[in-house]
Amino acid sequence: MSAPTVWRRVFSAMVALLSTAAVFAADAPKTEEVPFWAIGMPKSDVASKLAPVPSFPIPTAADKLPVSKLKLPPGFKAEVWASGILDARGMRQGDQGTVFVSSLFVAGKIYAVQDKDGKRVVKTIADKLFLPNGIEFHKGSLFVATPKDITRYDNIEANLDNPPKPVMVYDKLPGDVPHGWKFIKIGPDGKLYVPIGAPCNLCLPPDTHAQIFRMNLDGTNVESVVKGMRNTVGFDFHPKTGELWFGDNQRDWLSEDMPIDELNHVTKTGQHFGFPFCHSGMMTDPEFGWGKDCKDYVKPALLLGAHAAPVGMRFYTGKMFPAKYENAIFLARHGPWNRTKKYAADVVAIFIDDKGNAKMEPFMTGLVEKNEYLGRPADVMVMKDGSLLVSDDHNGAIYRISYAGK
């Protein structure tokens, strides 16, 4: 065989090989960025059969709300307090009685709800915000936290029809969407407490994340208070001890029944609550738990249910409810979003004894029917009259729970 013939055959083979590669390249699926809610999701058939992400909430007409389905202990009554509040999430009451309501993905709004002649009037006081879940009210000012920053609206109740330009308080938040929306609260020390969740389902978070921080009300002197926190969307301070208690949402995609979400009790600054090494105080992580021992981290005060999704919580400081509820925690469980069996979507009452031991009882139930959510509680708030408001972002509504006796 002559040399030219050999080279012709080699050249032909190379052309064929490159053509085949081009075909495979053309047929190869394009790589798409994983949505934040699916980060860490296994690619197995079992995981793919889990429930899809719920559709975004839409407001439900007042006469269609599931208030008749709500079940409460004897003597308690539930009623619709406000409706038509798209994506209703966090709640805070102003000095003059205005209830401020935050929202998340769909609305991006802050609402002001006023009681006029027995009816609730809803106004939008801020719009087109980036996941403004975190709100707090203090001395006439409304603080609003997004994943990126914290702003303040001064003298807001006197200017609901013409809200003032927000004042920047702190603009150095990382801006992450995964676990980036906030729940904020001013502690008994007069400082603003702000969480920065883990920017992932499961990872070794940077030093700037997976913590609860506190700062002065002008955004200065930021310091870490809690470490090893994955994603808290609700916390409060004990009325007697002043100590911080917080809910923490544990990792997804390990199993339907593990890990179990936590209620944690902070007794000193700098405590580490386990993430990402230990979950639920008893389970080392299959990936990050090697060489770790759950005994080295603060154990949860209470386990709240697998993927129950604890969100807003408050210690009860009102006078309307029976004495057993004094200083109890009311905690909203949003319910699992990626579990085949729906449950929670309720409000639980948590009782704490003098030694810090906690036990949980059902309080407001009835929002799961035929494995579907009828509503999903997002926050709770004690009103000045002692009644309890419960926001429902699934229906865009707020319920009022009162007690009239047996």
Predicted regions and their residues:
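Beta-rich catalytic cores
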Residues: 84-87, 106, 121, 128-131, ...
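Surface loop/turn motifs at the tips and blade-to-blade linkers of beta-strand repeat domains
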Residues: 80-85, 124-128, 169-176, 224-228, ...
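Beta-propeller domain segments
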Residues: 28-73, 181, 198-201, 215-220, ...
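Asp-box/WD-like beta-propeller blade repeats and closely related beta-sheet repeat scaffolds
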Residues: 122, 126, 131, 136-138, ...
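A short loop-to-beta-strand structural motif that recurs across blades of beta-propeller domains
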Residues: 109-112, 149-151, 211-213, 262, ...
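Conserved beta-propeller blade signature
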Residues: 98-102, 141-144, 191-195, 243-247, ...
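Short loop/turn segments immediately following the C-termini of beta-strands
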Residues: 104-105, 147-149, 155, 197-199, ...
